[in-house]
């Protein structure tokens, strides 16, 4: 204590070593103060959800809306992935046709199917004309179209119909992927990916983690200092099974994961932003795939996308309420967090722009106000 007082009151009494130590101490304090300001100025959002719920697409949208987007050279870099997605999709349908015993409508289609199956989809970097012709022929085959209509019975990329409908453009020489092509490209997220951007002079860091079960053990160290949790769930997966486990309903798995995350101690007072994604795909499939077949408690009208959306939102809301309240309404603990829900289409830039503005104006503004950053 005496030496500390001497440092403040009698700096001329210090030895050279003590003066050097004092300078180091001051520098450390300056760095710590700067770090504290920086920590307050960068807000961390954790992006969670099951595989193929649209997390990576959401990150791409943040780059387009709040960042520099994708330059022509960067979009060119997605070309092999777009090609691979097309080969993976067509291969999945050809294999499913055999399992589902769906015949080709034209005898020539067998030759084109054999050609496509001879190519390893993950080694594709160019799109040769013979493969382009084979793909275009097959996509016009009534058997392939019938197989596509039964896509809930096998795993097929959501982007399949989009890419196959644009084959002529995509297989042209000198093809450069559009922003929409990039948004719809699919590569499973492994490990942890982060994207930083600024909104109204506030730095945001969105942390995206792998959605497959095998990746979830890597989440643990992302939970600290998160101001909000964004949970993406697919509205269209009510009639599908997990890619990792063909016996488990994907929506039930997503609901269970949502409940598990809500129970984690790190999130006791963290606001939860629920994005019920893929409204477009739900609207496409609901006329022929009835929600009540997979969720018998649904009493709403058939072929009604709005009724289906409300029912699915209610399931997630009840899961949230159940994690806040114990049996018969008894409180499990003091929870100051709130649930904010939005219907989204992650491939629709205008939709995501509006939804994220709503998030910014509610959750982020509330948090910034609390720490006096507004």
UniProtKB/Swiss-Prot annotation:
Residues 41-374 form the G-alpha domain. It comes from the Eukaryota. Residues 273-280 are annotated as: G4 motif. The keyword Transferase does not apply. It comes from Homo sapiens. This is Guanine nucleotide-binding protein subunit alpha-15. InterPro entries: Gprotein_alpha_Q (IPR000654), Gprotein_alpha_su (IPR001019), GproteinA_insert (IPR011025), P-loop_NTPase (IPR027417). Guanine nucleotide-binding proteins (G proteins) are involved as modulators or transducers in various transmembrane signaling systems. Residues 181-189 are annotated as: G2 motif. One of its GO terms (biological process) is calcium-mediated signaling. Specifically expressed in hematopoietic cells. Expressed in epididymis (at protein level). Mg(2+) binds at residues 56, 189. GO terms for cellular component: heterotrimeric G-protein complex; plasma membrane; synapse.
């Amino acid at each position: 204590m005496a030496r500390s007082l001497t440092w403040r009151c009698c700096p001329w009494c210090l030895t050279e070593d003590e003066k050097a130590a004092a300078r180091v101490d001051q520098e450390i304090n300056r760095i710590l103060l700067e770090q504290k300001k920086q920590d307050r100025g960068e807000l961390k959002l954790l992006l969670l959800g099951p595989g193929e719920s649209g997390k990576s697409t959401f990150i791409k949208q943040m780059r387009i809306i709040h960042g520099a987007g994708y330059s022509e050279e960067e979009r060119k870099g997605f070309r092999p992935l777009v090609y691979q997605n097309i080969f993976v999709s067509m291969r999945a349908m050809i294999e499913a046709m055999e399992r589902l015993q769906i015949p080709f409508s034209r005898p020539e289609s067998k030759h084109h199917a054999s050609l496509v199956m001879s190519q390893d989809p993950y080694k594709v970097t160019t799109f040769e004309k013979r493969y382009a012709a084979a793909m275009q022929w097959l996509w016009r085959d009534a058997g392939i179209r019938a197989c596509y209509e039964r896509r809930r019975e096998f795993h097929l990329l959501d982007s399949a119909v989009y890419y196959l409908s644009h084959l002529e453009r995509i297989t042209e020489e000198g093809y450069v992927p559009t922003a929409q092509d990039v948004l719809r490209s699919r590569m499973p997220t492994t490990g942890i990916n982060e994207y930083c951007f600024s909104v109204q002079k506030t730095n945001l860091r969105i942390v995206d983690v792998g959605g497959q079960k095998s990746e979830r053990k890597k989440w643990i160290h992302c939970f600290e200092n998160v101001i909000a949790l964004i949970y993406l769930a697919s509205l269209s997966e009510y009639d599908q099974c997990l890619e990792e486990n063909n016996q488990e309903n994907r929506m039930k798995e997503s609901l269970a994961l949502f409940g598990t995350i809500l129970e984690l101690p790190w999130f006791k007072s963290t606001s939860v932003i629920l994005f019920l994604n893929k409204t477009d795909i739900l609207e496409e499939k609901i006329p022929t795939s009835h929600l009540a077949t997979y969720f018998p408690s649904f009493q709403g009208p058939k072929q009604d996308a709005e009724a289906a959306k409300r029912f699915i939102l209610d399931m997630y809301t009840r899961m949230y309420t159940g994690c806040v309240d114990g049996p018969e309404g008894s409180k499990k603990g003091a929870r100051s967090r709130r649930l904010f829900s939005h219907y989204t289409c992650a491939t629709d830039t205008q939709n995501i722009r509006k939804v994220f503005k709503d998030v910014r104006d509610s959750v982020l503004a509330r948090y910034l106000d609390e720490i006096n950053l507004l």
